[in-house]
């Protein structure tokens, strides 16, 4: 990873909430921003910030998520996801995260990612797939 990713570095991402990011299990009248979609959007915003500082052949994977979903966001509203680096410990990067829509704070917490060498990660995945295939026979 290139130097420069330090505590305090931040990124903001704005996303308009559509049906693909909303819950459906309570019916059309209760469609709101789904927690798994919010977490995915947080993860990608953090990843995008890391990728600005990644070397060729590097990427990052999520290690930990601790997020509170504080309020509903309706389809058509826009959320603003703000991520701020709290700490960089070697390849481990920790973030403070905040999500708000036009009216409320809707999410808050932390997320930690680990910068990986993609080639080594692919090898680990292939090795696990082979172990699973041998077990499943």
Task: Name these PLM-found stretches.
Residues 29, 33-37, 94, 116:
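Residues at secondary-structure transition points
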Residues 16-18, 100, 112-116:
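Short beta-strand edge segments in extracellular beta-sheet folds
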Residues 1-34:
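Catalytic strand-loop segment that frames the active site of acyl-thioester-processing enzymes
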Residues 67-102:
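Hydrophobic beta-sheet segments that form the core/acyl-binding groove
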Residues 40-44, 48:
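Short, residue-level hotspots on alpha-helical faces of the histone-fold
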Residues 112-137:
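C-terminal output/interaction extensions
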Residues 47-80:
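Hydrophobic beta-strand-centered segment that forms part of the acyl-chain substrate-binding groove
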């Amino acid at each position: 990873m290139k130097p420069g990713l330090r505590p305090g570095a931040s990124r903001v991402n704005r996303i308009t909430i559509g049906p693909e990011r909303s819950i459906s299990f309570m019916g059309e009248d209760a469609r709101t921003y789904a927690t798994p979609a919010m977490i995915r959007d947080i993860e990608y915003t953090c990843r995008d910030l890391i990728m600005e500082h990644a070397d060729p052949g590097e990427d990052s994977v999520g290690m930990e998520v601790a997020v509170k979903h504080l309020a509903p966001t309706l389809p058509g509203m826009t959320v603003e996801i703000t991520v701020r680096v709290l700490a960089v410990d070697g390849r481990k990067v920790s973030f403070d995260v905040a999500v708000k829509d036009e009216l409320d704070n809707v999410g808050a917490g932390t997320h930690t990612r680990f910068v990986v060498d993609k080639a080594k990660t692919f090898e680990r995945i292939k090795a696990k797939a082979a172990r699973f295939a041998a077990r499943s026979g």
